Regions:
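Residues on the lipid-exposed face of transmembrane beta-strands in outer-membrane beta-barrel proteins
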Residues: 52-58, 94-100, 132-136, 171-175, ...
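Flexible, glycine-rich linker and terminal segments associated
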Residues: 220, 235, 245-285
Length: 285
């Protein structure tokens, strides 16, 4: 717990400390509703959740950008669907990126750490993953973005594996043609060789529709909203988890940026499916 607090606290301090003239980024929060269905046990549950997130970026040299980000999320799914009373606890994720300008496009690398603890020390799941990413301008009003990463977990003493020895891909499209609104649609796919148990592969997918709309004169304060559908399958296990989410919140962009400018500068986040999938491992046990 002390290590967790130190890591997350350090990330948030760096983000808050970045709110100066030579940097840009955002801070925000959202609330939402998660509906989950365990097909194997025929359990259903819905729970509210809250998220706090932030990112800070700075230019490096003539063509580089460094981004640091942090996310903290908590939901209230009951132990009867999570399995064996292992209720979910606060989850968090931190990431770092370096992107390089190539004309109107950006190519880069990223590294991230996810932590999804539950009640009981034998059901805490952590993973490190990293890979390559890119943002490609297709027209003046549209862009596509993509990430491909490898991830691994070493959850000593856990009864299950989490996200062990796996790959994740993320592909999205953004529409920037509105004066004050950014819209994104994206898909995430992942497969790993140790999910619920060591010999059981994980087949994971998530689809999201996301938006941000400016509500003040310079679009620095935005309303955020989104919906997502995810499915988490462990081979050889009758349990399959389906999760649907809807959320609404706000973000404040600092450093003279806005949703669209921040996106074009490289603030695209990291894949969320690894953190989400580890949250449901005890349910598949």
């Amino acid at each position: 717990m002390k290590n967790k607090g130190f890591i997350l606290g350090s990330a948030l301090v760096m983000i808050m400390g970045g709110a100066q003239a030579d940097t840009f980024g955002y801070g925000g929060a959202s609330i939402g509703l998660s509906k989950a269905h365990n097909f194997g046990d025929r359990d259903k549950n819905q729970a509210g959740f809250g998220t706090v997130s932030g990112a800070v970026a700075t230019d490096v040299g003539a063509n580089g950008t460094v981004v640091l980000e942090a996310l903290l999320r908590e939901d209230k799914h009951r132990g009867d669907i999570v399995s064996n009373g292992q209720e979910t606890k606060t989850q968090y994720q931190i990431g770092a990126h370096y992107l390089h300008d190539i004309g109107d496009n950006k190519l880069g690398v990223f590294l991230a750490y996810s932590d999804s603890p539950h009640e009981g020390n034998n059901e805490n799941y952590r993973a490190v993953f990293g890979g390559v990413e890119g943002i490609f301008a297709t027209t003046d009003e549209t862009s596509i973005y993509a990430q491909l990463a490898y991830g691994d977990a070493h959850n000593d003493g856990a009864s299950s594996r989490g996200f062990e020895n796996g790959y994740v891909g993320r592909l999205g499209g953004a529409y920037k043609g509105f004066t004050n609104t950014l819209l994104k649609v994206e898909a995430e796919m992942a497969k790993n060789s140790g999910y619920e148990d060591a010999p059981e592969n994980g087949y994971l997918r998530k689809y999201s529709l996301l938006g941000e709309t400016g509500i003040n004169s310079d679009n620095s304060l935005v309303l955020t909203y989104g919906v997502s559908y995810a499915k988490f399958i462990s081979s050889g296990d009758p349990d399959t988890i389906e999760e649907k989410r809807i959320n609404v919140g706000f973000r404040y962009y600092f450093g003279g940026t806005s949703s669209t400018k921040a996106f074009d500068s490289g603030l695209i986040g990291v894949p969320s499916i690894i953190l989400d999938s580890m949250n449901w491992v005890p349910t598949l046990d």
